[in-house]
């Protein structure tokens, strides 16, 4: 598992504005990872599948997260174009895969759809699809708790709870990220995994990004021509499995891999090594055959 420290990032000013990004340089091949809500470029869970395949990782902070202003790109298609410019700026003429995790899924789809000459493959993990999301009640509640004015208080309270009573804090958070009971999900995590999640949740911030994620978005799945791998769990409480089914139905060359995770963090499931092998095979497959 990745060490518990935030990775160093860089800021570059492109035509649309400043962009924060992390570049873990390895081999010539590169994947572009779009993280989900409350995340930024320097935060990550498990990217060993890319390291094992000698693949570099480029991870930009999406609009409103980290040090990328919400005005840079702003919309899903807009930031897809910003990312294409970032790739050109860094000298990447081909991207082995666009990887979209959770709320980063729509941007990965747009990146692949709008830049087929750049992006070779698409990987979507627990990703939002073309279905409406979230429901009205959740949208209103999230708008109150994670607006730019209130998100600091919300996350400050959560950090305090995680320091004082980490298991209680994890139960509260997992209740919204899993369909099984939170006590059951927590019991299935190892002590190291619990420590890792406490570390991750304690560093999350929403900035102006989460409210931006709640904006309506166009369905671009039918415009994706590249092969795609969609990874999803029926017990994911954050993103319903129906989103994965809609993605596979909409993307002409998509395959669905079902995770057995009890929650939104598939990297902690027992079948993650098997899924990682599938991802590695997908990344290294010959696309000309």
Predicted segment positions?
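Gly/Ala-rich beta-loop-alpha elbow adjacent to hydrolase catalytic centers
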Residues: 100-104, 108
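Alpha/beta-hydrolase
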Residues: 142-144, 148-220
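Conserved HGGG/HGGXW glycine-rich cap/lid loop of the alpha/beta-hydrolase fold
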Residues: 23-69
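Conserved alpha/beta-hydrolase "acid-adjacent" motif
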Residues: 237-243
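Flexible "cap/lid" loop of the alpha/beta hydrolase fold
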Residues: 122-154
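Catalytic histidine-centered segment of alpha/beta-hydrolase-like enzymes
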Residues: 262-276
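Conserved acidic catalytic loop of the alpha/beta-hydrolase fold
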Residues: 78-96
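Short beta-strand/loop motif that positions the catalytic acidic residue
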Residues: 224, 230-232, 236
């Amino acid at each position: 598992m990745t060490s518990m420290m935030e990775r160093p990032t860089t800021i570059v000013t492109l035509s649309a504005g400043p962009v924060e990004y992390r570049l873990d340089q390895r081999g010539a091949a590169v994947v572009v990872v779009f993280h989900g809500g409350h995340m930024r470029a320097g935060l990550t869970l498990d990217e060993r599948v890319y390291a094992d395949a000698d693949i570099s990782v480029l991870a930009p902070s999406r609009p409103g997260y980290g040090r990328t202003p919400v005005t840079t790109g702003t919309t899903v298609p807009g930031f897809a174009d910003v990312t294409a410019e970032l790739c050109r700026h860094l000298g990447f003429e081909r991207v082995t895969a666009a990887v979209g995790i959770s709320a980063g899924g729509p941007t990965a789809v747009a990146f692949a759809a709008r830049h087929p000459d750049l992006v070779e493959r698409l990987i979507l993990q627990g990703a939002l699809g073309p279905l409406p999301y979230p429901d009205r009640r959740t949208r209103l509640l999230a708008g109150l708790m994670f607006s730019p004015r209130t998100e600091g208080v919300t996350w400050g309270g959560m950090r305090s709870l995680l320091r004082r009573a980490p298991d209680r804090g994890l139960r509260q958070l997992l209740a919204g990220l899993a369909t099984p009971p939170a006590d059951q999900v927590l019991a299935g995590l190892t002590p190291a995994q619990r420590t890792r999640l406490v570390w991750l949740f304690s560093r999350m911030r929403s900035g102006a990004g989460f409210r931006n994620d709640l904006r309506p978005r166009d369905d671009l799945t039918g415009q994706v021509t590249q092969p795609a791998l969609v990874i999803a769990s029926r017990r994911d409480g954050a993103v319903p499995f129906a989103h994965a089914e809609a993605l596979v139905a909409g993307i002409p060359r998509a395959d669905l891999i079902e995770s057995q995770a009890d929650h939104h963090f598939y990297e902690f499931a027992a079948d993650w090594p098997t899924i990682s092998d599938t991802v590695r095979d997908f990344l290294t497959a010959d696309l000309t055959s």
